């Protein structure tokens, strides 16, 4: 049987909100920190038990600014779990509204990871600063853009109109983030109330349109094209366009959208490498994407600047099912610029044998 004051038992009582049993246990033991660096206040705030929180703070004088091993305070816990009554109580007792945990996250940032407008309002009304950034350069508005609740974005723009003028340390904007996660209604808010450049690039040269396409969010891509003037042929830092990035991620429907509906050249090349979408799909081993590209008229014999075919990239990546499909579709092996055949690249020399196709063109 657990001794009075056992940390695990105390924490369990707090988690379950059993205030009466907790009082008896603490009175017998004289108080005790919770496990793993958490105080019982952390546990109470995390699980939303305001009555337990108040009892611990008032009857036992527990420090509402105590930190755990991640430097989280009880306010971080309450905010991140969406417990508005606990947030209000802690703020009412003078908790620091913009306290920082590891990685420089404030309670407001943590609240913005959930779709709980009430908690966000509570924090802002008590002076939380939406413009503060964490170690990755994200402010609360940027974090909210990842979650995609349009009401929260509208609220943050109302109380802090300049919150949208932000980018992460790798130059990604809230528009990039909302587009990547496919939040159509959030993107509509960003296009209506913010002034993002249509083809603003992050450190890798990626635009919001590329993000939408490579993640398969065709509705967002269409909106960016129709309402924001995004450029279909914009290139990333390696010269790859949206079509190429869709091939990398295996987004077949997005590829059909680009080629069949928008008229993008299925064999367009990345400027720095001369790779086509077929090359990119083969490099990643996406057999279904290769099928899609071929059905749209892709040239199976296209070569890059090193005279490599899609077969070379499939074999180099050890994507043997993909390589066999290319051979079965009529692609013949050939030497690249160094005289290397694709069949020389797999780790097992026999893997392409029996395909029924000659090794050389």
From Swiss-Prot:
SUPFAM superfamilies for the chain: Ankyrin repeat
Main subcellular localisation: cytoplasm
Gene3D superfamilies: Ankyrin repeat-containing domain
Pfam entry (one): Ank
Localization terms from the record: Cytoplasm; Nucleus
Site (Required to capture Ser that is misactivated by AARS/AlaRS) residue list: 102, 135, 165
Domain of life of the native organism: Eukaryota
A GO cellular-component term linked to this record: nucleus
Range of residues in the leader sequence: none
SMART domains the UniProt entry points to: ANK (SM00248)
Placement of ANK repeats on the sequence: 36-66, 70-99, 103-132, 136-165, 170-200, 204-234, 238-268, 273-302, 306-335
One biological process term in Gene Ontology: tRNA modification
Keywords from the named record: ANK repeat, Cytoplasm, Nucleus, Repeat
Complex formation: Interacts with AARS; the interaction is direct.
UniProt remark on domains: Side chains of Lys-102, Lys-135 and Lys-165 capture Ser that is misactivated by AARS/AlaRS.
Record's function text: Required to prevent the misactivation of serine (Ser) with tRNA(Ala) by promoting the hydrolysis of Ser-mischarged tRNA(Ala), thereby playing a role in translational fidelity. Binds directly to the catalytic domain of AARS/AlaRS and captures Ser that is misactivated by AARS/AlaRS, preventing the charging of Ser adenylates to tRNA(Ala) and precluding Ser misincorporation in nascent peptides.
Entry protein name: Ankyrin repeat domain-containing protein 16
Provenance organism: Homo sapiens
Lineage: Eukaryota, Metazoa, Chordata, Craniata, Vertebrata
